Amino acid sequence: TTWAEAVAKAKAENKLIFIDFYTQWCGPCLNMAQTVFSLPTVGYYYNQTFINLKIDAEEGEGITLAKKYGVRSYPTYAFIDPATEEIVHRSSSRQTPEQFIQTGKDANIPTKRSFYLQEQYTKGNRERAFLIDYINYHYSVYARNNVQAAFDELIKGGAKLTDPDVWEAYVNTINGMNPYLKQVSDNYADFCQRFGKKAVDAKLAKETSYGELAEIEAYATMKEKISI
């Protein structure tokens, strides 16, 4: 399928175009092809929802398309509006099947598209639900600094770590030693009552299993509390 054919088909079916930009030497690209793209659930969702193209960024018209859409790392997943031929959602990196399907779902929700999220963040949008979407997106593309900065802003804006949606975002996206981990440890009984001992212990155990020795020793009391 050529680019022109994909655009025409996407317009006719009123679908976005999905492009998997890869290279022959890209290890994560091969891993995604073998372990994620080949799964029936993933294939069914993407085939039903998008016009799909797998494009070698270093061969043929892939060179032009990669340059046009600013592809600098591999794999890059680009979702294109066929009417304008502009990219509306971008993702990347190795993802689990669940993450990859969610990436596709987000592409079809205008308020969860990467370009919308970045535009709104730049304009100063710091609404709670928006920040959580922003955090989840940047976690999915391994932009850890953006995740941490946005989570800090979420808390500074009045959200509490004990709020269910904030706790979920913390568990899923914030890693390593930080003040939030200490807050969980210092208020262990309260967090266990709210979210269950198993979930709290799992988070503490995960985050204290690596890091600088001095940091781990500083949080030694956590280990006394955890029994999993």
List the predicted regions and their residue ranges.
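Oxidative protein folding and maturation machinery
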Residues: 121-228
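CheY-like receiver
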Residues: 99-103, 113-132
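Short, solvent-exposed loop/turn and secondary-structure capping segments
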Residues: 29-33, 65-66, 89-92
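Thiol-based oxidoreductase modules, predominantly thioredoxin-like and allied folds used
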Residues: 1, 21-23, 32-62, 71, ...
